[in-house]
Regions:
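A short, contiguous structural element within a folded domain that forms the immediate neighborhood
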Residues: 10-42
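Surface-exposed recognition segments
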Residues: 4-7, 27-28, 45-126
């Protein structure tokens, strides 16, 4: 499932609908809001760019008691500091855009497929 629709092309930019056509070929991000929003009115929660999360990835990473991404077989929970990435990107597969899918990388890595989301608390609830 993707955020806002089960049809990936309705809500996400990924390799199947971004210029380039094959993973690794030249393509680009898209302006926010060109696809459907999700149920909360948020855009681009799936696809466009991978979003960095604050969670550290470990090979023991589990969701609901079940391992959801086996990861690399590195030794020691914090041998390498890897952060969780979610959402998929314009250069990745439709599977990577699923809400439940996670990826990870070292925290000082950057490329054209990743980004972050700014979040601000409205004055009315402070």
């Amino acid at each position: 499932f993707r955020s806002g629709s089960n049809q990936v092309s309705e809500v996400a930019w990924y390799v199947g609908n971004s210029s380039g056509g094959q993973y690794g070929e030249a393509g680009t991000t898209r302006p926010v809001g060109l696809k459907k929003s999700n149920e909360l009115g948020l855009y681009d929660m799936s696809g466009n760019v991978w979003e960095w999360c604050g969670d550290l990835y470990t090979k023991e990473y589990k969701q609901g008691g079940k391992s959801i991404h086996p990861g690399w077989p590195f030794e020691g929970t914090y041998l390498f500091f890897r952060r969780i990435l979610r959402g998929g990107s314009w250069g990745g597969t439709a599977k990577g855009c699923r809400v439940s899918y996670i990826d990870y990388d070292i925290e000082n890595y950057s490329d054209e497929y990743g980004g972050f989301r700014l979040v601000m608390e409205p004055e009315s609830i402070k």
